[in-house]
Amino acid sequence: MEPEVSLDSLLAQLATSPIAFGTDNPVNPALRADLEGALHAADVENLDPAGVVVLEQTPAHVADLRDLAQDLANSTDYGTVIVRTPQVAIGVSDHLNRVQIERGERAMVAEPDYADGLHAFARAADGVTVHWPLAVAVALLVLAGIAVAAAMTARR
């Protein structure tokens, strides 16, 4: 990770805002406003409560970002924590499953605009659902087909 990024600094920022930055940058206030606006949008409510950390560099070991996100999630009240760098988006969540998170990560990193990426993360994560009534109906149809085939074979 960036040498100047400290867990304590990120935790302090996340205590007062759902957005934290790894470095001071002149674009941070505008980016904070965009990201906070995105977090308050209706299509992002499936991430709620969410914290977003913006880092300017991707570490040599991307797994360090997942560790950072998990440490932040464990130390805050955010149910979802997303760490975004120019090349990578990493998320952890206590209410999204791994498939939802990974789809969200891929969708987010494809968006160069970080606020649009947050919307993309939420849409992709929300789009992963198992339609249980349909799954059960298909399973019953398959089982019925097997039973009919077995009955026809037994009659011969």
Where are these regions (language model features)?
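A structural boundary signal for the start of the first folded domain, especially the loop/turn
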Residues: M1-D67, I90-R156
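Mid-chain, structured segments of secreted extracytoplasmic proteins
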Residues: R66, D71-N74
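A short, hydrophobic beta-strand-centered structural micro-motif
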Residues: A73-V88
